[in-house]
Structure formats: C-alpha cells, structure tokens
Amino acid sequence: MELLLNKLSTFGNALPGDITQGLIWGIMAIGVFITYKILDFADLTVDGTLGLGGVTAVVLISNGVPVPVAMLIAFLAGCMAGLCTALLNTMLGIPGILAGILTQLALYSVYLDINGKANAPISVDKFPLVISSRYVTAGNEVVDIICTVGTALLFVVLIIAALYWFFGTEYGMAIRATGCNSSMSKAEGINTKRTTIVALVLSNGFVGLAGALLAQYQGFADVNMGRGAIVIGLAAVIIGMVLGEVILRKRFNFIGKLSFTVIGAIVYFVVLRIVMLIGLSTDNTKMFSAIIVALFLAVPYIQKTSKTSFRKAGKRAANAAIDEAEHLGAALANSVNSPKKEGK
C-alpha cells in the first residue's frame, strides 16, 4: 500500500511536467499533422528540424539576442529546412520520404556548424527563458507551475487559432484539396507544387518553434534531441484522431483534429510516465513509442474489419431468415393444397 501511495505521489508530482512537455511536443505534432493528415506527405525532415530549431534558439539567446527574436529565427530556420525538402521533391522529383531523409541528414551537419559541438546548454538563471522545467518540479509554488503550463498552452492555442484561420482561407483550402486529390486539384487549376512547398515550409516552421521551446524547457539543445521525433509526432496524431473520433464522433471537425493532436501528445507522455512508474526501463521508450503507434494505427483497421464482419454476419443472418421464411411459406402452401387434392 505504501509503495502504491509513493508511486501515486511521484506521478502527481511529475504530471505538470508531463503535461507541459506534451503541449510542447504537441506543437511539433501539429507540424506532423499538416504533412501527414492534410498534405498526405510522409515527411521525415522533422527529426532534424527539431534539433535545428533548438540549437538556433540556444545559440542566439546565449549571444544576447532577445528570446522572442531567437524563437522567431528558430521558426524561420525550420521553414528553410522544410523548403529544402519541398524543393527536392517538387523541383528534382525525389520521392517525399527520400527528400526528407536527405534533408534530415544534412541538418545534423548544419547543427554542428551552428554550435560547433553536440550539446548546447542554456540556463534559466542567466537568461530570461520563456519556459523551463525547473518551475514544474515538486516543491515549486503552484503559481510557477500554473504559469509554466499556461505559457505552453498559450502557444498551442495561438497556433491552433492561426492554423484554423489559415486553412479556412482560399489558399489553405487549396492545400487541403492537394492532399485529398492531387490530380483533381491540378485539373481545377491549383498549383500543387506551390501548395506542397507552402505546407512543408509551414509544417517544419512549427517543428522548429517546438524545438526552440523544448531546448529552453529542458535547458539544452542536443544534436540527437530530434531522433525519433517523427514517431512521437505520429503517435500524438494517431492517438488524437482515435480519441477525437470516439469522443466527438460526427462533430470531429478541423479545429477538433488540431486540438486532439495536442491532446494525443499529452496522453502519450502521461501514459509513458505510467509505464515508467510500473517499471519499464527508459532504454525501452523508443520501442514503447513504436508499439503505441502500431496499436493506434491498427484501431481504425480493426474497427473497419469488425464492422465489415458484423455487416456480413447480418447479411448472412438476414438471407438465412429469408430462406427459412420462403421454405416455411412453401411448406404451408403445400399443406393447404394437399387436402384439396385429396378431396378431388
């Protein structure tokens, strides 16, 4: 009993940090949502873009650049990474997955060129960082915890509001149409290459911004901080889509999808914390992430096949009932006609 209470206490103390981390990674997941769900483009650039945004912000802040300006430049650095992938795909005809891998590999070298070493630390004691994990650990004032979580939430709300507005415009609808049916979009006169470029630029811009926030939150940027980011992003998107469809059903609109993508990231980190408290080694977190993605990816397929099976079973039962009714009808008709024949 005491062990259980200790674990619950540990979970409660870690929960604000997990929520904050989920909100930050949720911004990255929104970037993945733009390419994966809206554009239908498998973009692997994000593993490199996250680290690029982080190191850009850390190096600039360390050299006296105001934090908001450093974060804006990190966003633009992410946009440039997305532009590279987009140009490789649209102008050179390189498949999307390969284009993302090539850019991702190049970004590791860019990271080292910017920082000169694999790790770039930054302290909240020396610089006025926007967010820091120091304020969400056990022992801090409730006000500090609320302000830290609220800061991350404010970024999320502003980004969702901006994207909801943008994808409701004519150009945003053109991007969505490109993802739905590229051939039909071309027939309607939409420049699909341009919409692909804009979507990838926007997506990686938000990933770069998430990297800047994450580096400030954890107190450092690392060349490997983005490794496996695409898995976490996909996990957040898939978890969010499944939860949204279950909870909202027919009311699951575009803004709901954006919101539940972030909720999916929070759920991911909370579940990860629970599993770690149970006793899973931190060395197995990547494997656990892959299992989560696989399970949630399988949910729509299982639902579809189960519905199909139920439909087939229903049809078989209906056909059997019809056959039985016809058989009974024929039997009754024979029994009615038999006395008449005997009377004659």
Regions found by a protein language model. Give the residues of each.
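Alpha-helical transmembrane segments within multi-pass membrane transporters and channels
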Residues: 32, 65-105, 110, 156-157, ...
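Short, non-helical or kinked segments that cap or interrupt transmembrane helices
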Residues: 35-53, 88-102, 171-174, 198, ...
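Transmembrane alpha-helical segments in multi-pass inner-membrane proteins
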Residues: 204-207, 211-287
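Membrane-interfacial amphipathic/re-entrant helices at transmembrane-helix boundaries
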Residues: 1-28, 56, 63-69, 141-145, ...
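Helix-loop-helix "hairpin" substructures at the membrane interface of multi-pass membrane proteins
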Residues: 81, 145-230, 234-235
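Cytosolic-side transmembrane-helix boundaries in multi-pass membrane proteins
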Residues: 10, 180-187, 191-194, 247, ...
